[in-house]
Amino acid sequence: MDLRHLIQDIPDFPKPGILFRDISPLLRDPDGWGEVMRQLGDLCTEFKPDLIVGIESRGFIVGTALATNRKIGFVPVRKPGKLPGDVLGIDYSLEYGSDRLEIHADALQGHPRVLMVDDLLATGGTAKATVELIEQAGGDLVGCGFVIELAALGGRQQLPVEIPVKSLIIYS
């Protein structure tokens, strides 16, 4: 099933010159969303993760649905100050500044096999920081899954070459 028709292009959002790829129509379509879960579920069958890690915020939608579907746990990676208790964090650079991501310090104890998911792979800065955070927390990253990849922005090259990456929709 071609999912591309379920992605809405929003020009000049969130700022002029940006073409935002909105997954909202995909989320509203049960057949389309079911296909996303089937394809990402195939990654779970192949890589046998113990946990799904999802990146704030749309990665939570993808990750919790996939984890529920596959009957495995979900771990959120969040912006700073959103998780209670002890956390591990990583600072990373953005195009115009920096940001920070955090994970519960005990979330990946015992070196679980982890599949990282998000809605979008663009420049790869957030994904790369999440990979480093997973490793710092003790997880064994076995793969990455994205609904959309903006290939021209080079995000895939920011990820470890030995980690399989699957994107369901690739825009060049």
Swiss-Prot record:
Q: Under which name does UniProt file this protein?
A: Adenine phosphoribosyltransferase
Question: What biological-process GO terms show up in the record?
Answer: adenine salvage; AMP salvage; purine ribonucleoside salvage
InterPro entries reported for this sequence: Ade_phspho_trans, PRibTrfase_dom, PRTase-like, UPRTase/APRTase
Subunit arrangement? Homodimer.
Q: Which family does it belong to?
A: Belongs to the purine/pyrimidine phosphoribosyltransferase family.
User: Source taxonomy lineage?
Assistant: Bacteria, Bacillati, Cyanobacteriota, Cyanophyceae, Synechococcales
Please tell me the species this chain comes from. Answer: Prochlorococcus marinus (strain MIT 9303)
Sorted alphabetically, the Gene Ontology cellular component annotations on this record are:
cytoplasm
For this protein, the record's NCBIfam families field holds:
apt (TIGR01090), PRK02304.1-3 (NF002634), PRK02304.1-5 (NF002636)
Q: What HAMAP family has UniProt attached to this entry?
A: Aden_phosphoribosyltr
Top-rank lineage group of the source organism = Bacteria
